[in-house]
Amino acid sequence: MNFFEFKGIKIAGMATAVPDRHQKMSDYDYLFAEGEVEKFCAATGIYEKYNAYGVGTTTSDLCVAAANKLFEKLNINKDTIDGLIMITQTPDYFVPPTSCIVQHRLGLDNCGLVYDSNIGCTAFPFGLQMACANIMAGCKRILLLVGDANPNRGETSNKDGLLFGDAGVAIIVEKTDEDISPINIAIETIGSGYKSLITPYGMERHPLPVVAQTRGFEFAAYYNNATYMSCLLYTS
């Protein structure tokens, strides 16, 4: 585990955007055995969520909306943003990085430091560490974007429909002379457990066209989802 302390840096503000589609967990009752959804809600505390499925809203759409809301709220001059970090596992495209698209859509022409990361559940602490490190290296104000949206993922009976909601969050991290407490972050990565959270097919290790030819596209699509979700829900 690594510990970081950043002095003279603050989180100036945060805004969130969600899709228009609002769902209650009880909407999924018909997909599961009686009592399963109720048990899930009791264990997780999740009773409702926002879902991008069917409305065509992507991660960049949500993050752009959140960022514009934050700029307006804080009355920020966009020319003062000198770094943009976007963390998502649901990018708009394989290439280019979604951060580049967001930079263009937000009109951040003077922002040269722009990049993506695909970290999942720990996106915020890792993203905050990246933002703070870049400020220590010379940036003054970073726009950190964290979000995921699955506009093409339908309802399934393997509990991913219950677990995942969609949202985009914009955070302004900036240098300050204020007398405030430092930002302390502890992060750890356990690479040996990579198979516990994996989508095995679709990239260069197991290209989707090859898998589809040998075992069928439906197998690849199902196994990607089933493997990821079974590990996520049933391993410690």
Task: Go through each PLM region and give its residues.
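Flexible, glycine-rich active-site loops centered on histidine and acidic residues
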Residues: G138-V169
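Condensing-enzyme catalytic core mediating Claisen C-C bond formation in acyl metabolism
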Residues: M1-G56, N158-C231
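Beta-strand segments within the central parallel beta-sheet cores of soluble alpha/beta enzyme folds
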Residues: F40, T80-I87, L113-D116, R141-G147, ...
